């Protein structure tokens, strides 16, 4: 699956699961370990875990399994690595603290739309 299609499927899964403040960054010019980063907030640790589950279920339906899935024990910040796309799912307070959008600010913002 192409990175752009993977990005769209993950974005749609987040929209369907009511992810908040979803941002998509094209980081191909900034790093070589991934093409896109998707950052989204959940209202609680449980919601963050639900967002992660929804992404993994959707991608499994498409025949893709994550390379890695980290942070579920606490649920404040869950990272799911699909190689070409990395999803960061966080509670708003954690997102404010780490401010990944600023850290990866050299990446280009991608305007994604839900189906």
Enumerate the predicted regions with their spans:
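Polybasic/polar functional segments that serve as interface/processing modules
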Residues: 1-33, 45-78, 90-94, 100-115
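Catalytic metal-binding acidic patch
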Residues: 35-37
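Short hydrophobic/aromatic beta-strand micro-patches
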Residues: 39-41
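Active-site beta-strand termini and strand-to-loop segments that position acidic
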Residues: 80-82
């Amino acid at each position: 699956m192409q990175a752009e299609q993977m990005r769209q499927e993950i974005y749609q899964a987040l929209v369907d699961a009511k992810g908040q403040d979803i941002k998509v960054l094209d980081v191909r010019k900034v790093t070589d370990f991934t093409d896109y980063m998707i950052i989204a907030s959940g209202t609680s640790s449980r919601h963050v875990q639900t967002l992660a589950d929804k992404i993994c279920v959707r991608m499994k339906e498409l025949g893709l399994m994550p390379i890695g899935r980290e942070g579920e024990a606490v649920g404040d910040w869950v990272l799911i690595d699909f190689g070409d796309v990395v999803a960061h799912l966080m509670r708003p307070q954690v997102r404010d603290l780490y401010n990944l959008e600023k850290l990866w600010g050299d990446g280009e913002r991608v305007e994604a739309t839900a189906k």
